[in-house]
Amino acid sequence: MTRVKVCGITNRSDLDTAVDAGVDAVGLIVDVDVQTPREISPQQAAELAAATPPFVTAVLVTMADVPDAATELVEAVRPDAVQVHGESTPDALASLGAAVEADVIKATDPGTAATYDGHADAVLVDSLDESGAGGTGTVHDWDRTGELVESLQSPVVLAGGLTPENVADAVEAAAPFAVDVASGVEAESGQKDADAVSAFVDAAGGCQ
């Protein structure tokens, strides 16, 4: 069964919406070098992480420098996992993983995903901008991601331009460990739509 992460949770209402829809993970965006309505403060993220119920993974999503700044942020927010965007070496990721009690996910593009295989608990394959940030809302080559699923040891999370309308095709093409969505389930920028979240979860799971 492909797991589902809804990223860019900014408030308790949207957290409840995602949990009620049956998501497996929620993303809390803190300390990123891009303008996004989904970014929240470390304190807000810590409150939402603490409110996330058992069996739902709270994921800190950040561009903080690895390992030092990212380690401090993980200690402040106390998530179940940390998803790292931007430039970082495999050794830096390993240092982060050794320093925190959280799984480490590396966001990357299809061309560089293999670099981080085995150095992170999972790799998230996204359509990244020049800064290494995701959230572009752009679809990439799902067949290429499927090849990574077959060749990498690390679990592969598929992100980039996913919606309730196309996620079933994406899962069929790539068979990822999980799919990740943000803008594709929003009624307006930064605000989740309950119907869209439920439809996304149903579509991602219905094609198994």
Swiss-Prot record:
Pathway: Amino-acid biosynthesis; L-tryptophan biosynthesis; L-tryptophan from chorismate: step 3/5. One of its GO terms (molecular function) is phosphoribosylanthranilate isomerase activity. Its EC number is 5.3.1.24. It comes from the Archaea. It catalyses: N-(5-phospho-beta-D-ribosyl)anthranilate = 1-(2-carboxyphenylamino)-1-deoxy-D-ribulose 5-phosphate. InterPro entries: Aldolase_TIM, PRAI_dom, RibuloseP-bd_barrel, TrpF_fam. GO terms for biological process: L-tryptophan biosynthetic process. Keywords: Amino-acid biosynthesis, Aromatic amino acid biosynthesis, Isomerase, Tryptophan biosynthesis. Belongs to the TrpF family. HAMAP family: PRAI. This is N-(5'-phosphoribosyl)anthranilate isomerase. It comes from Natronomonas pharaonis (strain ATCC 35678 / DSM 2160 / CIP 103997 / JCM 8858 / NBRC 14720 / NCIMB 2260 / Gabara).
